[in-house]
Amino acid sequence: MALKKLLAATALTLAAPFAYAQSALESGLGELEHIGKPEQAGLSFQAGVTELASDIRWLDNMLLVIITVISVFVMILLAICIVRYNARANKTPATFTHNTPIEIAWTVVPILILVFIGAFSLPVLFKQQEIPEGDVTIKVTGYQWYWGYEYVDHEVGFESYMIGAPATGGDYRLNDDVRAQLADAGYTEDEFLLATDTAVVVPVNKTIVMQVTGADVIHSWTIPAFGVKQDAVPGRLAELWFEAEEEGVYFGQCSELCGFAHAYMPITVKVVSEEAYEAWLAAAVDEYGGNPESLPAFETAMN
């Protein structure tokens, strides 16, 4: 227990100056609407702000219609069989063993349905996997249990911890000190477990390429509002891309079980105007230039 307290205090001492400096940089971004986050009693996707997210929502709605029609059809058939062919209504059961036309139909029709679905789903999949040339390239490294980011074209690197994690002086619980940190960073109390002490900052309407890897175990970098999710596998470098169409703050979380603090590994992305991004980047280069702390200590291979 004493060792854990010592490690937590050491992490706080090392991380605090960086966290406050990063907050000062982000304070120049102005007020941003908090768009991409879970909603109480929400039953659908988060509001999508990328073409990828819109495509996924459209595909999901189309599949819902198809599945609903199939389910209703099957339930009607079951109801007919129950009513017309129960023991009381049909005292003399049929003796035939097969019906060739029906068997052909229930084989061919599902094949046609799957081909129809594939004709629309495969283009969505390919669009996600075909990585365009990025206006901004950011390397993401998953650690137990925080994220490291490196703007590879500018040698700017920083680490991102959940507000309330031991590295920020917390113990993964919401208390008065954590409430104060959330308020100082511009977050609300219900954004605890989502907000981080440092955020990824990207320009609006620009192609962002994220190069994702892991330093210890498998993690997964996910932003629902962007329609992106990529596993962070140690020893491999995978890519995803997005182009956010609306300024705001967007939240995500690690989506691959990675240990006891998996639930405390959120992601915060701030989408800002190009002018605000350039100003933030210039300040970040001055503050962190030449210090890409998120570089893992091993070679990675493209997959």
Regions found by a protein language model. Give the residues of each.
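N-terminal secretory/membrane targeting signals
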Residues: 1-24
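Residue-level signal for alpha-helical transmembrane segments in multi-pass membrane proteins
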Residues: 14-17, 77-80, 113-116, 120
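Non-transmembrane, membrane-proximal soluble domains of secreted or membrane proteins
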Residues: 23-62, 85-303
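Hydrophobic alpha-helical transmembrane segments
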Residues: 65-79
